[in-house]
Amino acid sequence: MASYPTFDLNSPRDLSGVYTQEQIDKMSDDDYKNALYSLWTNYCVSESYEPGSTFKPVTVASALEEGVVKDGDTYTCNGYEMIGPDRLKCHVYSSGGHGTITIEQAVMNSCNPYMIHLALELGNEKFAAYQSLFGFGKTTGIDLPGETMGIVYGNKMTTIDAACNSFGQTINVNMMQMMSAYCSIINGGMLYQPHIVKRIESANGEVVKENKATLVRQTVTMSTSKLLRRYLKSTVETGTAKKVAVTGYSVAGKTGTAQKSPRSENKWLISFIGHAPADNPKFAIYVIIDEPDGTTGTSGSSADVLTLSHDILEKLLPYMSVYKDSLEPETDTGTAEDEYTVDGVPEGSIQNTATENLQNMPSIN
């Protein structure tokens, strides 16, 4: 778990890594305090945000569980859906939509109209109930202070709320909620209370404290879990997340591009949530770049978070002794089409990652 910008624990009030001296000199006392609080805040648990398309696996899993969609079912995306007077667009709106696609292709290509269709078929009450089942709107119980609950509509959900929630807008979550929900979707349906430390041992090897895996509840069946793993694997192999692929390993996951409020400011939050190995998960990763501006040396678009996710996995998997697959897929090095291009936003990019070890999850072969 990490956030950037960060601070030196030996000099926690040093803002020089984030602000120029001129900016610091101009700060009022309140501005200075707020800058410190912002720097010290653990984004992964204490900040909530609209997740965007990384929420789509939750929508799809809920719909599969309720039987409102089956593997192979198709829906026609014309580039938008009308909810009353509101036109909710797909990211390929300008080209006329995705056409008739399967549910797997909807995940691979991040189709909004298909997700809206699923939410409407579920109905407001059931969709809200599944959000609660996956842990949204409540704390995860992680052993860190200051966890936010996020914001959900619950029994006040309207049709337009459900439609927007289906692709991760107008719902606020924290990173650990998303990570916990995602892990339950791909590990066979088991939602666990997350912990930072598994065990504390003394210098002579005695166990001082041990956090045993605590099962909270089951969210989905094994059959739904296997389908989502397949869909998410396809998303990395041939869908919107091709840039995350790591040579020699099977990786699965979902991209996200969320427009921040107020919408008129045209600011974005881009993300990737995924796991490896794809068919037998050992690790999950969640990476966010808040308001990308290209200062990482790339484009300031959703490609940035995919490159960062790839780089993390490329180092993480061999370091944690995860064996390569027998067949090594080719890593996509071309320019994959982004869900959105997000250029020209102000400075202040924040990169956040949350990674969870799934070694103690039940076998899901």
Language-model features and meaning:
Residues 207-209, 303-365:
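Short, gly/Ser/Thr-rich active-site loops of penicillin-recognizing serine hydrolases
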Residues 282, 294-296, 319:
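Intrinsically disordered, low-complexity acidic/polar segments
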Residues 1-53, 58-289, 355-365:
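Beta-lactam-recognizing serine transpeptidase/beta-lactamase-like catalytic domain environment
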